[in-house]
From Swiss-Prot:
Subunit structure, as described in the record: Homodimer and heterodimer. Component of an RNA-directed DNA methylation (RdDM) complex.
Phenotype seen when the gene is deleted: Likely lethal, leading to seeds abortion.
Name of the protein: Protein MICRORCHIDIA 3
Entries under InterPro entries matching the protein: HATPase_C_sf, MORC_ATPase, Morc_S5
SUPFAM superfamilies membership: ATPase domain of HSP90 chaperone/DNA topoisomerase II/histidine kinase (SSF55874)
Length: 589
C-alpha cells in the first residue's frame, strides 16, 4: 500500500532536520541521504505538528500469543501453519530469486536494542524489489509468480508467514530496474494497527531513488506523507534513528532483501514459541513431550533420533529436506552455518524406481516414485512418502497404509507430484481426483513392494506360507520367546540343532537386521507346522509392541496427572490465601 495522503492513516509531520546524525557519510543510502531529504522537505513542515524523529520505545501488545491475538487479526483466516513451515515460506521467496542471481538466504536471530527481545532475520542477495514490487508484496492477495518453476502462487505467503512468526515485521530492499536504482522500507505492524485503533490495514513505506549522485525521496502524494510514514516506521520498528534504519539497507549491499520479524509470539506458558538456546546452530520448536516425560522408553528415544521426528522440531532438519534437488550455487545459511541438503532416497535399502503416469494420455513424462526400506529397518517402524511439488516438500512421510497395520513398516518413498495442486499453506494437497488416484496407487505400491521384500528383514507376508528354503537355525541356547536381534548372525556360526530352538532368520546382501523368533521344541512344536509357528511368533511380537506402546502412554498419563496435581495444589494454595485475606478483612470490620 503506497504511503499516499489518502492511505497514510495519519496526519503527523516528522522533523527530519535533527542533530542525531552528525556523520558526514554521503554515500549511496548513507546518513547523508537523510540530510538531503530533510532539507528537501523542510519547507513543507508545520511547526505546530512537528514531532521529533527520535521517539519513545515502541509499545507492545497486551497479548503475545498468536492464538489469542484477537478476532480482528489482520491476516486472513487459515493462517494456522506451524512456525517451521512459516519460515519455509520465507525461504521459498529467496529460492525463487535464484533466477535473479540469488546465491544465499541467511536466517538468524538478533536482539532488538530497544528491549533486548529476540527477532528473526531473513536476508538474501536476489534482485530485490522496486517500490511497486514491495507494495504488491505487502498487500493482501497479490501474486506476480506465474512461472512454472516458482513455488508461490497465492500471494499471501509473505504476509501470513511473517504474522505467524511475530506480530510485526519490517522489510528493507534494494533493486535496479530499467537502469533505475531504488531502495525501500516497509512496515507491517500488527502492534501499530491495534495500538492506534486503525480500521484499515495501514502499511507505511518510504522509497528512495539512488540512481542520482545524491539519493532523493520518491514522493507519491506530498512530502508530509513521506515524512509521516518515516515517523511511523521509526516509532514502531526496532530502529529509533534514521542512521540505524539506513544502516540496515547498507548491510544488504547493492541488491537484495532483508526481513526482520520482531515481537515474536509466545506460547500459552509465556515462553517464546521458537527456541534459540537449545542449539546455537539451529532454531527449534519446543517439543513439550521431551520435557514432560522423565523416563522415556528406548524405542521412543530411537524414534526421536530419526529425521522423520526431528524435522518437526528442528528448522535445520526441516530445511535440509525442504527441496528435492540439490542447489548448484545457492545456500541456506542458518545461524551462520550452511544447511546440508538431504534426500532420504539416497540411503534407502533395496531401492526400486516405479514410473507412474497420472494422466490418461502419454504426452507428459511419467512421474518417478522411488521406494525402499529405511536403513534403520526393522528397528524403526518409520514409513511414508515424502511428496514434493515443484521441488518443494509438501507432505513429509505421508503414511498411506492404515494406522496400526504392520504392512509397509519401514518402507519409505520419494516423489515429485507436480500434477496435483498444494493447499494454500503448502502443508497438504487439494483433495482432487488426481490426488485420490495417487493415494490409491501409492497404497498398491507399498503392498506390492512389501510382499516382495519384507522377508529380507524378517517380516512375514500375511496369508503366504513361509519359504522353507530360507529357514535356518542357530546353536543350542535356552529357549526364549520374542527375541529381537538387530544384527545378522555370521553364516559360519549358524547350524541346525535337534534340541535347540527353531528360528526364522533371513539375511541377504542388503539387509543388516533380522527378526529372530525362538520356541521350545518340546512344549510347543508338537503338531504345529512351520507356518503356524511363524504366525504365532509374529502375533507375540506384535503383542509385545502393543505393551510397549501402552507403557509409554501410561507413563505420559502419569506425567500429565502429576502436572495437573501440581496445578491443583497451586490453585488451592492461592484460594487459601484469598480466604484468609477475606477472613481478616471481616474481622477488622
Amino acid at each position: 500500500m503506497a504511503p499516499e495522503s489518502k492511505n497514510a492513516g495519519v496526519s503527523v509531520v516528522v522533523n527530519l532536520d535533527s542533530d542525531s546524525d552528525s556523520d558526514n557519510d554521503d554515500g549511496v543510502g548513507g546518513r547523508g541521504a537523510f540530510r538531503s531529504m530533510a532539507s528537501l522537505m523542510d519547507k513543507h513542515q508545520v511547526p505546530s505538528t512537528t514531532a521529533d524523529a527520535t521517539v519513545a520505545p515502541r509499545e507492545n501488545l497486551e497479548c503475545r500469543s498468536f492464538w489469542k491475538a484477537g478476532e480482528n487479526f489482520v491476516i486472513p483466516t487459515g493462517v494456522t501453519n506451524p512456525a517451521a513451515p512459516a519460515i519455509a515460506e520465507l525461504i521459498d521467496n529467496a529460492v525463487d530469486e535464484i533466477q535473479n542471481g540469488a546465491t544465499f538466504v541467511k536466517i538468524d536471530k538478533i536482539n532488538i536494542v530497544k528491549d533486548n527481545s529476540p527477532a528473526l532475520v531473513f536476508q538474501d542477495d536476489g534482485g530485490g524489489m522496486d517500490p511497486d514490487g514491495l507494495r504488491k508484496c505487502m498487500s493482501l492477495g497479490y501474486s506476480s509468480k506465474k512461472s512454472n518453476t516458482t513455488i508461490g502462487q497465492y500471494g499471501n505467503g509473505f504476509k501470513t508467514s511473517t504474522m505467524r512468526l511475530g506480530a510485526d515485521d519490517i522489510v528493507f530492499t534494494r533493486s535496479t530496474r530499467g537502469g533505475k536504482s531504488t531502495q525501500s522500507v516497509g512496515l507491517l505492524s500488527y502492534t501499530f494497527l491495534r495500538k492506534t485503533g486503525q480500521d484499515d490495514v495501514v502499511v507505511p513505506m518510504i522509497d528512495i531513488d539512488t540512481s542520482k549522485e545524491r539519493p532523493q525521496p520518491i514522493i507519491y502524494g506530498s512530502a508530509e506523507d513521506w515524512a509521516a510514514s518515516l515517523e511511523i516506521i521509526l516509532k514502531w520498528s526496532p530502529f529509533s534513528t534514521e542512521g540505524e534504519l539506513w544502516q540496515q539497507l547498507e548491510d544488504i549491499g547493492t541488491h537484495g532483501t532483508k526481513v526482520i520479524i520482531y515481537n515474536l509470539w509466545l506460547n500459552d506458558e509465556g515462553i517464546y514459541e521458537l527456541s534459540f538456546h537449545d542449539d546455537n546452530e539451529d532454531i527449534r520448536l519446543r517439543d513439550e513431550s521431551v520435557h514432560d516425560s522423565k523416563r522415556v522408553h528406548h524405542n521412543l528415544l530411537e524414534l526421536r533420533s530419526h529425521i522423520s521426528y526431528h524435522l518437526r522440531y528442528s528448522l535445520r532438519a526441516y530445511a535440509s529436506m525442504l527441496y528435492l534437488k540439490r542447489f548448484n550455487n545457492f545456500k541456506i545459511i542458518l545461524r551462520g552455518i550452511p544447511v546440508e541438503q538431504f534426500n532420504i532416497a539416497d540411503e534407502l535399502r533395496l531401492p526400486e524406481t516405479i514410473k507412474y503416469n497420472p494422466h490418461t494420455t502419454k504426452e507428459k513424462a511419467p512421474t518417478e516414485i522411488k521406494v525402499g526400506f529405511i536403513k534403520e529397518a526393522p528397528k524403526l517402524a518409520v514409513c511414508g512418502f515424502n511428496v514434493y511439488h515443484k521441488n518443494r516438500l509438501i507432505r513429509p512421510f505421508w503414511k498411506v497404509t492404515m494406522g496400526g497395520e504392520r504392512r509397509g513398516s519401514g518402507v519409505v518413498g520419494v516423489l515429485e507430484a507436480n500434477f496435483i495442486e498444494p493447499a494454500h499453506d503448502k502443508q497438504d494437497f487439494e483433495r482432487s481426483s488426481l490426488f485420490q488416484r495417487l493415494e490409491a496407487r501409492l497404497k498398491k505400491i507399498v503392498s506390492n513392494y512389501w510382499n516382495t521384500h519384507c522377508h529380507v528383514f524378517g517380516y512375514c507376508t500375511y496369508g503366504m506360507p513361509a519359504d522353507k528354503s530360507k529357514r535356518i537355525a542357530i546353536p543350542d541356547q535356552p529357549p526364549t520367546v520374542n527375541t529381537f536381534n538387530p544384527l545378522p548372525l555370521p553364516s559360519d556360526e549358524i547350524r541346525v540343532s535337534q534340541g535347540g530352538p527353531i528360528i526364522r532368520e533371513i539375511s541377504l546382501s542388503n539387509a543388516t537386521s533380522s527378526r529372530i523368533a525362538a520356541v521350545d521344541t518340546e512344549n510347543n512344536l508338537v503338531g504345529k507346522s512351520a507356518h503356524e509357528i511363524s504366525e504365532e511368533n509374529i502375533q507375540l511380537f506384535m503383542r509385545c509392541e502393543e505393551y510397549v506402546k501402552k507403557e509409554t502412554e501410561l507413563e505420559q498419563t502419569v506425567s500429565n496427572l502429576a502436572k495437573e496435581l501440581e496445578e491443583t495444589k497451586s490453585k488451592c494454595a492461592r484460594l487459601a490465601l484469598l480466604v484468609d485475606a477475606k477472613r481478616r478483612e471481616m474481622q477488622q470490620v
